């Protein structure tokens, strides 16, 4: 079954969602997202390449291991090298030499995270990061912030965010939104949500003036308030977005997140793809796939790799432990990633102890290959109605 979406009365040929199978056991589903740069099988994991690259890897390696969708951050690309330079290079795909699909965010997440700290920071009472406080003013027009690179003032609006994402030329783009802190009064949260909806509408209007063979996902907000989540779904599903991302705070625990997703996902159109923003650790994926999430993005597998944590079917292992100094087996038997195909645990352990940069590349390519294979396993289990 194919679902294709219209923009201003025009038939879209460049972005389609194809439903392959819906599980008889849960809301889990297998699908395909068709984009100008290829197909994304769902459910799937999205690697985060903040500055146009996944840390420690080049983009040809992502292609070789079959990682179908990559997430790049508009905020960072705006400040360095500048989206105009990327546009002159022919867009992100040409600039970073990636042939497969790319999704970019609006820049709002990074701006507000630097201002308030991440939800994780707040829950752990860390407060804002040392670059925090860079947001100077939030108005109806947008957000005025100070660049962490050179201290210059930058005004980010729905229109300028979309202009930047047009310069980047990703397959899927995100409207400008506000990310309020976790601990916020309901009145303030409602005010933030209303402004986010206005910003998302302005973003959509700017996008539709020049679709440029890009799809735009709305971002559902509302924090941990069920009524506001419902309101956000009701407002955004009335607009001609091509898909829906679930964003904002999802609670303190995985149980709270599960409850919010169980409420939110049935309110989204079944004929359009959805995405869970910034959540892609293994337990969260395991609990969210049965709810019908199509794609997940997270820096967890790559960040863990750089700290010596390798993902395996038996659970994560810490390669820096001395027990691996004389283990000449591969990371995981049967794994076909470059690290497992060529090198032993002992060698990778040695590289970490010697602080050789190669250790991060080998650990990262293994963890991402693990994620690719994990999502393939989930798709197979859904098609067999086991999930």
Swiss-Prot record:
Keywords: Glycosyltransferase, Metal-binding, Queuosine biosynthesis, Transferase, tRNA processing, Zinc. GO terms for molecular function: metal ion binding; tRNA-guanosine(34) queuine transglycosylase activity. Its cofactor is Zn(2+). It comes from the Bacteria. Zn(2+) binds at residues 335, 337, 340, 366. Residues 278-284, 302-306 are annotated as: RNA binding. Signal peptide: none annotated. The active site is at residues 105, 297. It catalyses: 7-aminomethyl-7-carbaguanine + guanosine(34) in tRNA = 7-aminomethyl-7-carbaguanosine(34) in tRNA + guanine. GO terms for biological process: queuosine biosynthetic process; tRNA-guanine transglycosylation. Pfam families: TGT. Binds 1 zinc ion per subunit. Pathway: tRNA modification; tRNA-queuosine biosynthesis. PANTHER family: PTHR43468, TRNA-GUANOSINE(34) QUEUINE TRANSGLYCOSYLASE. HAMAP family: Q_tRNA_Tgt. Belongs to the queuine tRNA-ribosyltransferase family. Homodimer. Within each dimer, one monomer is responsible for RNA recognition and catalysis, while the other monomer binds to the replacement base PreQ1. Catalyzes the base-exchange of a guanine (G) residue with the queuine precursor 7-aminomethyl-7-deazaguanine (PreQ1) at position 34 (anticodon wobble position) in tRNAs with GU(N) anticodons (tRNA-Asp, -Asn, -His and -Tyr). Catalysis occurs through a double-displacement mechanism. The nucleophile active site attacks the C1' of nucleotide 34 to detach the guanine base from the RNA, forming a covalent enzyme-RNA intermediate. The proton acceptor active site deprotonates the incoming PreQ1, allowing a nucleophilic attack on the C1' of the ribose to form the product. This is Queuine tRNA-ribosyltransferase. The gene is tgt.
């Amino acid at each position: 079954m194919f679902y294709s979406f219209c923009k201003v009365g025009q038939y879209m040929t460049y972005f389609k969602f194809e439903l392959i199978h819906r599980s008889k056991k849960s809301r889990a589903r297998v699908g395909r997202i068709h984009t100008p740069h290829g197909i994304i099988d769902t459910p799937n994991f999205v690697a985060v390449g903040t500055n146009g690259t996944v840390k420690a890897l080049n983009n040809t390696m992502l292609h070789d291991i079959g990682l179908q969708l990559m997430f790049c951050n508009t905020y960072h690309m705006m400040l360095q090298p500048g989206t105009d330079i990327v546009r002159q290079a022919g867009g992100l795909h040409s600039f970073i030499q990636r042939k497969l699909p790319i999704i970019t965010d609006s820049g709002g997440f990074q701006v507000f995270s630097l201002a308030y700290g991440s939800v994780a920071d707040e829950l752990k009472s860390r407060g804002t990061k040392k670059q925090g406080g860079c947001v100077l003013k939030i108005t109806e027009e947008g957000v005025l912030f100070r660049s962490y690179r050179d201290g210059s003032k930058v005004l980010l609006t729905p229109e300028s965010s979309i202009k930047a994402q047009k310069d980047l030329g990703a397959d899927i783009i995100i409207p400008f939104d506000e990310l309020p802190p976790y601990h916020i009064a309901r009145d303030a949260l409602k005010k933030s949500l209303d402004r986010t909806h206005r910003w998302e509408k302005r973003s959509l209007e700017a996008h539709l003036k020049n679709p440029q063979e890009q799809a735009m996902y709305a971002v559902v907000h509302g924090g941990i308030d069920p009524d506001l989540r419902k309101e956000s779904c009701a407002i955004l599903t009335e607009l001609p977005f091509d898909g829906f991302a679930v964003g904002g705070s999802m609670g303190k625990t995985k149980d709270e997140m599960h409850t919010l997703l169980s409420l939110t996902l049935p309110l989204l159109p079944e004929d359009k793809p959805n995405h869970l923003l910034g959540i892609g650790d293994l337990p969260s994926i395991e609990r969210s796939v049965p709810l019908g999430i199509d794609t997940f993005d997270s820096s967890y597998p790559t960040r863990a790799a750089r700290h010596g944590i390798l993902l395996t079917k038996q659970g994560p292992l810490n390669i820096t432990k001395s027990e691996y100094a004389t283990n000449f087996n591969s990371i995981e038997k049967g794994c076909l990633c470059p690290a497992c195909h060529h090198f032993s645990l002992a060698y990778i352990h040695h590289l970490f102890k010697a602080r050789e940069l190669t250790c991060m590349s080998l650990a990262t390519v293994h963890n991402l290959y693990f994620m690719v294979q994990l999502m393939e396993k989930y798709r197979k289990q859904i098609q067999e109605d086991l999930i």
